Regions:
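Conserved catalytic-core segment of NTP-binding enzymes
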Residues: 2-104
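C-terminal lobe/tail of nucleotide-utilizing enzymes
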Residues: 57, 61-166
Length: 166
């Protein structure tokens, strides 16, 4: 992709560990995990971490989690707040500050064969995706550290961890 000068290429995969997902994880270095702020989404996170660790050991040692994006967030519910807190506790700074709110426009857009940004660029959901994209582009690379396994850390945190190791 470097020949085309892309900064990012997103490969959307199902959460199950099928052939498509294994091949995608073998072809990339970074994984961004969207997590719905719902109860059952948390159950799959542990399995996903195990799968990433397994692929790192067997196929792609460079594979790591560089971002987690909280989606379908509903600030009116305790559940969304609890899921967000648990995800932030497990993944730390790799979780983006911007969240994608539950939105009718985000739900409607695929039915029209469009992204929410094309369907309704001024909607809350579209603006949230813009904000998340800006955050990704400006926060710097989150690379794995030997002490963090498959979870990336900011360059500042990596430097602190290196100092602690010395």
């Amino acid at each position: 992709m470097k020949q085309y000068e892309f900064d990012y290429v997103f490969v959307d995969c199902p959460p199950s560990l099928g052939l498509l997902t294994i091949n995608a994880m073998n072809a990339v270095d970074e994984v961004m995990i969207p997590i719905q702020c719902e109860y059952y989404a948390l159950e799959g996170v542990g399995q996903l971490l195990n799968n990433i660790s397994m692929i790192r050991q067997a196929l792609n040692p460079n594979l790591h989690i560089s971002a987690v994006l909280l989606t379908m967030f509903d600030g009116r519910t305790k559940l969304s707040e609890q899921v967000a807190a648990e995800v932030r506790g497990q993944f730390g700074d790799v979780v983006l500050r911007n969240v994608i709110p539950r939105s009718v426009k985000v739900s409607e857009a695929p039915g029209f064969g469009q992204t929410v940004i094309d369907y309704d660029p001024g909607s809350t959901g579209a603006m949230a995706y813009f904000d998340a994209a800006k955050e990704l582009a400006t926060r710097g690379d989150y690379q794995p550290h030997p002490t963090t396994g498959p979870i990336g850390v900011s360059p500042e945190i990596a430097a602190q961890l290196d100092q602690e190791d010395n």
